[in-house]
Amino acid sequence: MKSLRTDRQINGLALAEASGTAFILAAASLLLCLSMQAAQAQITFGGGAKQQKPTPAEWEAVANAIGKSGSMQPGDVFKIGLPRTDLEVTVRGVQLNPVLALGSWVAFKKSPNMTMVMGDLVLTEAEVGPVMWSLQESGIDMTALHNHVLDESPRVMYMHISGHGEALKLAEALHRALSYTKTPLETPGKATLKTRMPARIELHQLEVVLNRTGKENSGVYQFSIPRAEKIMENEMEISPAMGVATAINFQPIGEDRAAITGDFVLVASEVNPVIHTLRENGIAVTALHSHMLDESPRLFFMHFWANDEALKLARGLRLALDKTNSVAH
């Protein structure tokens, strides 16, 4: 015989069902809340998503700590240029404009949990030891030390650096290291500029030959040409403004001539084709080396020098660029 449920049993079942439904809804609400918090944390701190950008005030504090103003570059990079306007360096009778080959710089980029700094410091031989000691004491790594040009007088060296940590502490450490040099740290707008040489070459002529956009900086025509692939180091993308773009500089030296220098950023398979092309076009290779320690793909930096008719040199440089996986115009 089929049993009949009492009102108490029916009410009990209804209450249990209602309680179960409420529990499920509460659990779902909790999971949704946790999911939203996790997504927000990913946005704030990284994990492949967009991270919070430093405020202008944060970068201003970095600039003040170093003692020199800087500017934002593509890729959320804050870069400070430190030209060695205190040095008078000649190469085979050509006095170098500091912008051509004597430009120290440091560049900062915020990562999810810290700030990265990379840089290139132009140093006299006497400055190398004290600067290296100061950086090592502060936890900033030296990743390379070498020449960029040949036959220069007085001798100059180039120290490449890399560090990770809190941005202001990195800036303070760099200021201490720079205090062992005579690098000018003038207030913005008061840097000493060299007198420009008379010239019959113009920027747009070089742009046409190189098929790239350049800029004029204190009498030097500059081109920065990024590589097409991403450059990574320690799971962080290295922006071109942090020293991984091919740099080509022209210093007019009268009439239609220019002194050129810079560096090609290359993978291993490109090294010898570019050497061959440069030499075929009267451009000397002055150095080949690395600037970093853990980058991917592995990069080689090839420095060059020539003093000749500017458009002729530009044509040779264009042929060399065509041997590389560089971003097109």
Report each predicted region and the residues it spans:
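N-terminal secretory signal peptides that target proteins for export/translocation
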Residues: 1-20
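Intrinsically disordered, low-complexity regions enriched in polar/acidic and amide residues
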Residues: 8, 36-41
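Bacterial N-terminal signal peptides
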Residues: 20-37
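Long, contiguous binding/interaction regions
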Residues: 42-155, 162-299, 303-329
